[in-house]
Amino acid sequence: MQSLQILAIVSLVVVAIIAIVVWTIVLIEYRKILRQRKIDRLFDRIREKAEDSGNESERDQEELSALVEMGHLAPWDVDDL
């Protein structure tokens, strides 16, 4: 009975560690999706303003360049090589 209790405790710890890792990955991916949506909205605003007025908005371009300069959220996720 003692070894069964130890095995149960060890398995609970392993499951907890796996859950933390999975939810961390989910959070990172969710943040990347939100960031990409923000960039897409800025592109749309710049396109609309360029079509309406003939020139692009400086504030939107600065905001977009600031987002793009933030770099990658995770150093192991480099797809632009």
Curated annotation (Swiss-Prot):
GO terms, molecular function:
CD4 receptor binding; monoatomic cation channel activity
* Entry keyword Transport: yes
Q: By its UniProt entry, which Pfam families does this protein fall under? A: Vpu
Any inhibitors or activators noted? Ion channel activity is inhibited by hexamethylene amiloride in vitro.
- Where would you find the membrane-spanning parts of this chain? 8-28
User: Which residue ranges does the entry give as Cytoplasmic-facing topology?
Assistant: 29-81
What does the function comment of this entry state? Enhances virion budding by targeting host CD4 and Tetherin/BST2 to proteasome degradation. Degradation of CD4 prevents any unwanted premature interactions between viral Env and its host receptor CD4 in the endoplasmic reticulum. Degradation of antiretroviral protein Tetherin/BST2 is important for virion budding, as BST2 tethers new viral particles to the host cell membrane. Mechanistically, Vpu bridges either CD4 or BST2 to BTRC, a substrate recognition subunit of the Skp1/Cullin/F-box protein E3 ubiquitin ligase, induces their ubiquitination and subsequent proteasomal degradation.
Family statement = Belongs to the HIV-1 VPU protein family.
Q: How does it assemble?
A: Homopentamer. Interacts with host CD4 and BRTC; these interactions induce proteasomal degradation of CD4. Interacts with host BST2; this interaction leads to the degradation of host BST2. Interacts with host FBXW11. Interacts with host AP1M1; this interaction plays a role in the mistrafficking and subsequent degradation of host BST2. Interacts with host RANBP2; this interaction allows Vpu to down-regulate host BLM sumoylation.
Protein name per its UniProtKB record: Protein Vpu
**Which gene name belongs to this protein?**
vpu
